[in-house]
């Protein structure tokens, strides 16, 4: 049950990535995703592996965060409206809790090796992870706005 709630929280934070208007809000959102991912790994793998994943994830995020801060002007976070975040979280929890039959692998299932990944009972879990990655990629492409060219122009 805890792994299901972690996955639902990761989905909700993925959906709220697009609502981030400033780099600070985006950084906090990605930090929450890193904490959820590390806690998920710590719950059914080793805590050392979760710690390493967290450090790698945060290190990459800090580089990107510093780059975006250098490109964007200082913006004030004003009129922060929590309603879109709450609505997306509520819809995600209610839809996935009542309509799906996702089996999250337990520690005893993991001892079977990599064959657990290809079982039919874990197919919705893999599709869900792939959709999270796809949605994150689309959000990053939308935020960088391809039509405006490169983030930093090349100057020889």
From Swiss-Prot:
Subcellular location: Mitochondrion membrane
Top EC group: translocase
Lineage top rank: taxon: Eukaryota
Keywords carried by this UniProt record: Electron transport, Membrane, Mitochondrion, NAD, Respiratory chain, Translocase, Transmembrane, Transmembrane helix, Transport, Ubiquinone
Primary location class: mitochondrion
One term of GO molecular function: NADH dehydrogenase (ubiquinone) activity
EC number: 7.1.1.2
Catalytic activity line of the entry: a ubiquinone + NADH + 5 H(+)(in) = a ubiquinol + NAD(+) + 4 H(+)(out)
Membrane topology: Multi-pass membrane protein
Gene Ontology annotations for the cellular component aspect, listed alphabetically: mitochondrial membrane
Residue stretches spanning the membrane: 1-21, 24-44, 49-69, 77-97, 121-141
Function description: Core subunit of the mitochondrial membrane respiratory chain NADH dehydrogenase (Complex I) that is believed to belong to the minimal assembly required for catalysis. Complex I functions in the transfer of electrons from NADH to the respiratory chain. The immediate electron acceptor for the enzyme is believed to be ubiquinone.
Family membership: Belongs to the complex I subunit 6 family.
Full protein name: NADH-ubiquinone oxidoreductase chain 6
The gene coding this protein: ND6
């Amino acid at each position: 049950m805890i792994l299901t709630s972690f996955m639902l929280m990761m989905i909700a934070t993925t959906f709220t990535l697009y609502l981030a208007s400033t780099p600070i809000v985006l950084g906090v959102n990605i930090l929450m995703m890193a904490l959820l991912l590390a806690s998920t790994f710590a719950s059914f793998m080793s805590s050392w592996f979760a710690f390493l994943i967290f450090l790698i994830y945060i290190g990459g995020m800090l580089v990107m965060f510093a780059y975006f801060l250098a490109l964007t002007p200082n913006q004030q976070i004003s009129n922060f409206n929590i309603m879109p975040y709450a609505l997306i979280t509520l819809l995600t929890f209610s839809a996935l809790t009542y309509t799906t039959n996702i089996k999250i692998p337990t520690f005893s299932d993991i001892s079977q090796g990599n064959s657990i990944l290809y079982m039919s009972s874990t197919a919705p879990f893999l599709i869900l992870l792939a959709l999270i990655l796809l949605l994150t990629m689309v959000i990053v492409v939308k935020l960088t706005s391809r039509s405006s060219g490169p983030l930093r122009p090349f100057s020889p």
